[in-house]
Design a protein with these regions (language model features):
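Long hydrophobic segments that form regular secondary structure
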Residues: 244-252, 261-318
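Juxtamembrane inter-helical linkers in multi-pass membrane proteins
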Residues: 78-88, 138-173, 248-273, 321, ...
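Hydrophobic alpha-helical transmembrane segments of multi-pass integral membrane proteins
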Residues: 110-137, 144-172, 289, 319-353
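Alpha-helical transmembrane helix bundles of large polytopic membrane transport and channel proteins
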Residues: 1-28
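Extended, low-charge hydrophobic alpha-helical regions
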Residues: 68-109, 151, 171-187, 294-419
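Transmembrane helix-loop junctions at the membrane interface of multipass transporters and ion channels
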Residues: 197-223, 396-407, 428-439
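Core alpha-helical transmembrane segments of integral membrane proteins
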Residues: 42-138, 142
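Alpha-helical transmembrane segments
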Residues: 221-238, 337
Length: 439
């Protein structure tokens, strides 16, 4: 039985500790006691989880505060380079439509994705890798293990969830650390409930405009942490549902080793986080962003009568969007943002403003004015944030799921699970808002 197995493992570990105490000589006699004193706080039955959430909020605050200016500088630099390239094409007498396709379509989307993704990843991934190198991540898995046990999933899934905060594709690949095929598949199917840093800018922007206007960055970080907690709760819920239905089974035995705390090797941390994670993820995103730019340009510039294809599709989807507390432009932006979540908000603005290329609002006041004139309320913003948290994975993540599972069936399931969840929650929010006369 499980109880007998746990008892046997406990006895083996205690015996091994007794043998080690008699046979091992330590250069630093009190290192074990030092680690245990730290663990008494970080893995405490009551305080361990709040401390973990506080650390997460600090990481988000540093990422939010640190990424703003580099993103702006990159955007301005790419804008200047775009004008140089445009002038070069004009000097070569390139047809106007081809110039617009290359610059306003492909180049604009590529550079937008890069300027939005690169700075947060360059900050988040090193901090994440630093926690990994120090030895904290196994403690985080320990804090969450009881919740995964109740969900009949593996505690190692906590590590893949943390990786998903940087990039869901990286988190899905990280599911290889889970030995059980059943539990590994559960982790893959639910990883998208963790918002990646491609979704952070949209969440942060909407929080700043509708919920934390004039407040400090700490308020935005706290609200963003709240969205992470909601994503984690949905992960536990769906892990339990999958474990009790299509992926039945008991959780495999999980021996979680808490390694000693160690001094991080900063050089290796930077190289591993920037090259193995940041550059890898950015390369995949850029690869799929180029064809997306072409499709978006075509829809924004091809007319049927007096309207563009973009406007026609938005009008067609409007009844569905209204039912979900949003509108057709928002739904279409999510669909066209399938290659990269970073371009969802710019596509919305492009539709609202009738532009033929991706549009930047400039500042939160201007964005609030544009959204307000198009019927947005705090309920709309809340529904968009929920759907940003719970919708189909981006194309990079979908390709990674297909590669890891070897099945289009499970890839479609990974797309359907968060999307159905998001649609249901948005419908409930919209229904409740109508019942109470808010909208």
């Amino acid at each position: 039985t499980a109880a007998l197995r746990d008892m046997s493992v406990t006895r083996i570990v205690l015996t091994a500790e007794q043998i080690a105490e008699q046979a091992v000589t330590r250069e630093i006699p009190d290192y074990y006691e030092r680690d245990r004193r730290i663990d008494a706080v970080l893995t405490h039955r009551i305080w361990g989880l709040p401390v973990m959430l506080l650390m997460l909020m600090v990481i988000f605050y540093i990422t939010i505060a640190g990424a703003n200016y580099p993103s702006q500088w990159l955007s301005e630099a790419f804008g200047s380079l775009g004008e140089v390239l445009r002038n070069g094409l004009i000097s070569l007498s390139v047809p106007k439509w081809l110039e617009s396709v290359l610059i306003d379509g492909i180049y604009c989307v590529l550079t937008w994705v890069t300027s939005v993704m690169l700075p947060p990843m360059a900050i988040f991934f090193p901090m994440f890798t630093l926690l990994e190198d120090v030895g904290y991540l196994p403690r985080a898995a320990f804090n969450l293990d009881k919740y995964f046990s109740r969900s009949k999933a593996c505690g190692k899934q906590a590590l893949t969830m943390a990786m998903g905060l940087g990039c869901n594709a990286a988190g899905i690949t990280g599911c290889r650390i889970i030995d059980s095929p059943r539990e590994r598949l559960i982790a893959v199917l639910t990883n998208n409930f963790m918002p990646c840093n491609g979704r952070f800018p949209a969440l942060i922007t909407l929080i700043a405009v509708f919920f934390a206007a004039g407040a400090s960055g700490a308020v935005s970080a706290a609200m963003l942490t709240g969205m992470i907690v909601l994503g984690a709760a949905l992960t536990f819920l769906w892990s339990r549902i999958l474990s009790g239905t299509v992926l039945k089974g008991m959780p495999a035995s999980f021996a979680l080793e808490l390694p000693p705390y160690r001094r991080p090797q900063i050089g290796k941390v930077l190289v591993r986080s920037l090259l193995d994670r940041t550059v890898f993820v950015l390369g995949r995103a850029v690869t799929v962003a180029a064809p997306a730019g072409l499709v978006i340009w075509l829809m924004a510039n091809v007319h049927a009568g007096d309207s563009t294809l973009l406007a026609i599709c938005a009008d067609f989807l409007d009844p569905v969007g209204r039912f979900l507390g949003m509108d057709g432009a928002i739904i279409l932006a999510f669909i066209l943002g399938f290659p990269a979540n970073e371009i969802v908000i710019p596509i919305m603005l492009m539709i609202y403003m009738g532009q033929s290329t991706l549009t930047e609002a400039g500042d939160t006041a201007m964005l609030a004015d544009i959204l307000g004139r198009n019927g947005w309320t705090w309920v709309t913003a809340l529904c968009v944030m929920v759907f940003m948290l719970c919708h189909f994975p981006c194309s990079t993540s979908c390709l990674t799921i297909k590669k890891e599972t070897g099945s289009w069936k499970w890839t479609l399931a990974a797309m359907a699970i968060p999307t159905v969840t998001g649609l249901a929650i948005c419908a409930v929010i919209s229904w409740a808002a109508r019942i109470f006369g808010i909208i």
